[in-house]
Amino acid sequence: MKKLLLLTASLLWAACLALALAATADAAPRAIGGFFKQTHQKNYMARDQRGEYNLLHKSVSGIGVDKELRASYPLLTKAINEINQGEFQRIEELSNRMKDEAAAFRETAPDYYHPFQYEFDVLMRRADTMAVSFLQYEYTGGSGVHGMYHWQGVNLSTVTGAPLPLEAVVRDKKALAGAICERLRADYPDSPFEQLEEKIVEKALTDQLNWTLDPQGLTFYFNPYEIASYAEGLLTATILFKERPDLFQGPCRQPAAAYAQPFPAYYPLTTSLRDNGERDVISVYEAKGSVHVVLNGTDNAFPVDLADLQPVLIHMEDGRNYLYIDGTRQGKSIRNTLVVQLGSRSARYVDTLAYSFRHTIAVAPRVQEYWHFLTNPNGFCIDQESPFISTSKTDICAIGENGTLTFG
C-alpha cells in the first residue's frame, strides 16, 4: 500500500508538471512575487494572590498572497490558505495547553516562574512558475532548562498547489542519502554523528526527510536531537543540482534566470552564484555595530549598525549577485536595508537604503505588522523607512543596474 501511495503521488506530480509546462510558454521557470506574511503578537495575562502576571507571549505569522497572485494561481492560494488554517488551529490548541502549564508552574514554583513563550514564523525559500517552497519555524519555551525549536520545509506546485514529493526531483533516494551523509560529515567535521548512515537511509526510504526546494538545489534540515545533540543546533545539508546531476530529475532543476532567495541570518546559505555547480556559502551576522557577510570563508565587515537581520540573496539575469540585508537601526524603531554586491570571495558595499520589507498599519488597538517577501527581483514591494507605530508607505520597485532600487 505504501508503494502504491508513493507511485500515485509521483504520477499526480507528473501531471502537475505537465500542467505547469502547458501554462508557461517557456520551459524555464520565471520568478514570481506577491508573497507576504502578517505577524500577530499577544500577551495572555492572568491574576493570582500575588497580582496580575503574564502567562504566555505568543507571536504567530502566516504566509499570504496578494490580489494579483491570487488571480494568477487560485489553486496555490487555496493550498496556502488550507495550510494556514490547519497550523492556526493546531497553534490555538497548543497555546491553550501552554497557558494551563504556565499557570501550574506559577503555582508550584512561584520563585522560579517566568512567562512561557511561543513563536511560529515563515520564510520563503523559492517562488517561481514551477514551484513554491518555504520554511516554517516553531519555538516553544516553557518551564524546562531550554526551549525547543523546529524548522519544517513545505514544497508545492505553483499551478496546482499540490505537495511536491521528493520522487519528483530525486532519482535514487538511497544514493541521495549517501550524498547527504557525505555533506554532513564535510560541513560538521567535529560532530560524532552516531549511526548517521542508518538514520539518513531510513528517513529517505520512509519519506521522513525534511527539505526545501531551492533555486540551485535541495536543502535538508535536521532539528535538535534528530541526528545530533541539542547543543549542535539545526544542521543542514545542501546538495546542488549541477554538483550532483546524477541524483536529480525533472524541470525543477532549472532555476529562474533572475530570482531572490530569503534565508535566515546566522545560518549558512549554500548556493551557486555563477550557476555552474560550484558551491558558494554565505552567512550574515551583526557584531559590535557592524554587519558581517561571510562569503566562502572570508569575513567582510560593513560599519552599518543594524540588528535583527533579514537577508535576501538576489541573482540577476546577467550573473550579478547582491544581498539585501534588512535590519533595525540600533536604538530606533526604524529599519533600513544594507545592499552588498557579491564576488567570488569578497563583498562590496553598494548602499544603505531608507527602505524596509516591513509594512506597518497604525490602527487601534495595536499596530498591524506585515512583511513583504522579496522573491522576484524584477518586481517587488518595499516600504519607505518609518517608525513602527506609524503607517508605512509602500513602493513598487525592481533591482537596477547598480544593485539599488528602480521605481515604477
Predicted regions and their residues:
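Repeated scaffold domains used in trafficking and secretory/extracellular systems
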Residues: A307-I314, Y355-W371
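Bacterial N-terminal signal peptides
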Residues: A9-A20
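Compositionally biased intrinsically disordered regions enriched in Thr/Gly
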Residues: A25-R274, Y285-H292, D299-E317, S333-R335, ...
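Hydrophobic beta-strand segments that make up the repeating blades of beta-propeller
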Residues: V281-V284, N321-G327
